[in-house]
Amino acid sequence: MELKNGELHIWKYSLNTEDYISEKNKPLLSKNELTRCNQFLQESDKMRYICNHRFVRNVLSLYLNIAASKINFDLETRGKPYIKNSNLFFNYSYRASYGLLAISKNQAVGVDIEKIKPLQDILTFSEFSFSEKEKEIIFKSENELEPLFTFWTFKEAIIKLLGIGLNADLTKIDLSNFFYNELNPLSYSNNEIFTIKKIIVNQGFKAAFALKGNLLKYQEFDFNEHKTYNQN
């Protein structure tokens, strides 16, 4: 598959696809991935990890035109994975049985998906997570969880794009303007331009991507409908 500068591809997939949750998926992963997989205590978490990383490798193989098992990943200083010797940027996120993979060319990208769920102390969570403008939007809403999780996916996506980690002061990352201005590139910090957009996913979930720079073209794909991969 071809990807040009300014384009972004979002792949959606289901992590409970029976064909992928099995021991046969393990040989596709690297030694580092298998080591990480074995650190999970629950078998279901191990299988979810294997399934997710197989999806990521199979989709990326379509763009790199090499076997999925031959893709070499490395980690940035803060743990964000990247592909060695490639101008492709990618990021993935999964919750419950759903996942997203974002792919761009020469532009950093972040993506996040979250399951909407009740919070024990929404006021305290918001106080440490959102700016004053974001909180104003959240608490003016009839259903506070809807904008709250929208903003949380915005934050996760931009944090993953920048690779700064959740230990950053999230209240200083004000993304309130993006709530009403989807796809309009806005300045976030240091005069850098970012594009943030909600992704429509299954009911009960929220998702978003963040792209550094302008977005010229945006496409979504369903992994479960795509049958050709460079697996071996």
Regions found by a protein language model. Name each.
Residues 1-232:
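Core catalytic alpha/beta fold that binds nucleotide/phospho-ligands
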